[in-house]
Every structure is written in structure tokens, then in C-alpha cells.
Amino acid sequence: MQIRVSDEGAARDCLLVLGWGNRCRHRNVQWLIDQLATAYRVHAVELPTHITDYRAEWVEPAQEYAADLGAFDLLGHSAGGLTAAHLDADGVGNRVYLSPWWDTDLPVPQSVLDAVASLPITRPFIPINTLDADAIGDLATARQLAEGPSSVSPAFLRTVLRAQRSLPPARDTAAAFCSLTDTVVDPRAVGERLSADRIRLYDGGHELFSSSGREDTVELVLDALQHGPDAL
């Protein structure tokens, strides 16, 4: 896990847990960091890609880092939203989730997915062909797409399913942004965990920050992050 700090002199801290394959060097991720940096000292967490234990490799390292921050607000995107939902630190203030990976709508029966996930294999060999610009967002760059994950292992699927099935109750300070046309994660899982007044929809792909309508929504993201779901 890599954590990069953007400090423009803001007094408040934001822990930004990026999605699966997101890196700070990607132009659209940097755009999001720049927006947050107008109000926060941003601690951007880059999650490791091929894992076998979500708690040991995603949640616990982020939680250990967060313990040293004091008070902070929390923003998680996709797999970062899954990780952030499990994060329990004394200093957490408001929580905002962007297209959180709380469930996946795959074109296979759940029994088949569970069978594949049960295989004792850690090598990523199952191809992923859905993470293109149509799915991610119309502003997705060639570099961003080329550097994204192209396969997963059964062990990865197994630990992600465990993370999704063991989510703690949503906190009162949580809000979420998602697109109903998201083909990467299942937006219905957001509606199952948060009431409608704590959810805002946007037009675009899985990544708000890689979608051309991002300018219309990012101020509301900042409002929810700074002031909580009542700001929506």
C-alpha cells in the first residue's frame, strides 16, 4: 500500500482511499486530489491490486495510518469505498463514498461465482474485459486504462466477496454518489445501505472523476465531505 500526501496548507485532513488500480499519477485521479486539496490536506491511499486478504492488505494498513491522523474526513472510491466502509478509527468524521464496490452485478449465477472463488489459486488468470472507457468514464485516459488490472485470481474474488458480505452497518455520517448506469459495481447495493436522502446520482461512468459531468458534482462531494449528509 502506498500513501501520498498533498499538502497545500489546509488545516483539515482527508483520507482518500482510491479504487482498484487507481494511481495518483493518473491524470483524473490527480484532478480529484486537486479539488480536495482546496479544503484538505489529502492523504491518498493506493490499494495493492492482487490481494488474498482484504482485511490484512487493505483495511488494516489504512486503519493503522489513520490512527496517526487525529480528526479526518474519509472519502472512498470503488474498492476504496469497500475498504473505507470497514475502516473504524476514532478520528473519522464524515464519510463519502464514490461508486462504492459493495456488490457486483455479474452475468453469472451466484453459485458459479462462489465455486470459482473457492478455488485455491492466488495467480490472477481470470480476464477482465469490462474496464474500458465506456465503463470507467468518457475522460478516461489511455494510460489509465492500460495500467488498470486485466485479470483477477479466485483468491481475490473470494476475499472481495467476504468483504462485501461482512460490511458493517452504514454510519450516520455517510453519504454516497453513484451512477445508475454503472457496469463495474452494482449501484443497488448503495440503495440497500443508505436512505435516498443520503445518495446523489450523477450522469457518467463508474469513476465520477473520469466523467465529463464531474464539474457539476464535485462541489457537492466537497460539501458532503465537509458538512455531512445534511449538505445534500
Could you describe each region identified by the protein language model?
Residues 94, 98-173, 178-185, 191-205, ...:
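The alpha/beta-hydrolase serine catalytic core
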Residues 49-69:
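Alpha/beta-hydrolase active-site loop
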Residues 84-89, 187:
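Short, hydrophobic alpha-helix immediately C-terminal to the catalytic nucleophile
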